[in-house]
Swiss-Prot record:
Specifically methylates the N4 position of cytidine in position 1402 (C1402) of 16S rRNA. It catalyses: cytidine(1402) in 16S rRNA + S-adenosyl-L-methionine = N(4)-methylcytidine(1402) in 16S rRNA + S-adenosyl-L-homocysteine + H(+). The lineage of its organism: Bacteria, Pseudomonadati, Pseudomonadota, Gammaproteobacteria, Enterobacterales. One of its GO terms (molecular function) is rRNA (cytosine-N4-)-methyltransferase activity. S-adenosyl-L-methionine binds at G35, G36, H37, D55, F79, D101, Q108. This is Ribosomal RNA small subunit methyltransferase H. One of its GO terms (cellular component) is cytoplasm. NCBIfam families: 16S rRNA (cytosine(1402)-N(4))-methyltransferase RsmH. SUPFAM superfamilies: Putative methyltransferase TM0872, insert domain (SSF81799), S-adenosyl-L-methionine-dependent methyltransferases (SSF53335). Belongs to the methyltransferase superfamily. RsmH family. Its main location: cytoplasm.
Amino acid sequence: MMENYKHTTVLLDEAVNGLNIRPDGIYIDGTFGRGGHSRLILSQLGEEGRLLAIDRDPQAIAVAKTIDDPRFSIIHGPFSALGEYVAERDLIGKIDGILLDLGVSSPQLDDAERGFSFMRDGPLDMRMDPTCGQSAAEWLQTAEEADIAWVLKTYGEERFAKRIARAIVERNREQPMTRTKELAEVVAAATPVKDKFKHPATRTFQAVRIWVNSELEEIEQALKSSLNVLAPGGRLSIISFHSLEDRIVKRFMRENSRGPQVPAGLPMTEEQLKKLGGRQLRALGKLMPGEEEVAENPRARSSVLRIAERTNV
């Protein structure tokens, strides 16, 4: 199934253009997926350029290993550890660009066996790396009702979080859920008001997936590490697919695009101001997919690309 899958990369040209590729530069694709961004980056690099790709999905790693290019290397692991990968290669402060395409990928969603989709029945798994960590089924079977409700409210912005959490716990007491269809049916039955444009399990599946994969913590750690690994003038090019992701990226870029916040009238010398440091990033704006891309790939509709540049400070 994996070999026959045709994956359309969202905001492909825009995200790579945002990196402002130098032929001899060193770049990181933190979310290799099926390699759309990586292949385009490689096509713009010269012989001296290098691309380090990262993914925690074993299926993505299998695809990456088919790329026979001395300029390219792949790491099986979370992109939150990019600081460690860069340090191991003695490349701190030498990275010219980092690209992140956040969230679950289309191949993951469309493969029922991965357990990400309420539209296809499969094992209730949802792990981006099925070789480690708790599956969605395991977590839902052991979590307290209050914890499930908190996850649904916080990561799914689900208004009926308490009702749904109660229904999940009650169902698991009777017979533990192991299939995506079972969870989708429990959520639908527990939802008193249906949205005619959205499946009632949409928010629950998003929330459980984010929790199981620690997705928001992964993003925050990767962003924090990026400041240390980027060279002056190095770019961040980040695609988000929902408001929780985009909020983190937007806040990070905004906060690091400011200079030191000093109260008005506070007496400080030039030397003291220098020690506080200046802004570390320059936000270069955001892009959203055009009508043509959305028509061709409806999943692109909610995507937002934000670009920033490391300053010389």
